[in-house]
Amino acid sequence: MQPFIKPTIAFLFFVLISCQPKPDKKVFDQVNLKIQSIIKPKFDYSILEDGDIVLKRGTGQVSILMIKYLDEKIPLSHCGIIVKEDTSYSVIHSIAKEYTGIDGVQKTTLSYFLSDAKLKDSYIVRHRSPISKRKILKTKALGFLNNKIPFDYDFDIRDTSKFYCSEFIDHALKSTYKKEYFSRKKIGHGEALLLNSLLDTTYFERILN
């Protein structure tokens, strides 16, 4: 276990989510549908492809906490992998059960994923590889979803049995391309994955922003 990460990020994360009311699944679904019905696309979603990666700067307390600890040039707090389903787009990502009623890797609509972020604070990037390879990235993400990988409340990047958001992307990318893309930041005796790594245009093309 990483001794500094756990009493800082992980502990504060628990304090924040413990203050949140437990979600009612029925109410959550109703709110989700309502938000989807009123959100209008502000850019051409049709240009998106399987395996694109979406990043955002959330506005919640945990997002603010993550932004503070990562202290990156472009403040970001959450990410996921886009999958195309007929004419709609979904995002596979990992998040704590306290926010959605589902623990760990899960799927939601792209519009709902972005509903708590401003478009100017959101990014969509695409790995500079053939679509056939990016479809493998999508397949890896779906595999983690089907295996119901739990959320990593310890924020321990050495533990591959559970993922927090960027850890999920990290494993999907590494298992697809056999390459490390995330830079890491030392925090005490531990390390954190830096989301700005995915904005490196050497490896990723920016589709949004």
Regions found by a protein language model. Give the residues of each.
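Activation targets extended, charge/polar-rich intrinsically disordered C-terminal tails
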Residues: 20-24, 153-209
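Soluble non-cytosolic domains of exported or imported proteins
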Residues: 48, 74, 128-135, 159-164
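Glycine-rich catalytic cores of cysteine/serine-nucleophile enzymes that process amide/ester linkages
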Residues: 58-123, 151-159, 163
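N-terminal accessory segments that precede or flank the first globular/catalytic domain
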Residues: 20-85
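C-terminal motif of bacterial Sec signal peptides marking the signal peptidase cleavage site
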Residues: 16-18
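Sec-dependent signal peptide recognition
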Residues: 3-11
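A structural motif
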Residues: 111-120, 127-149
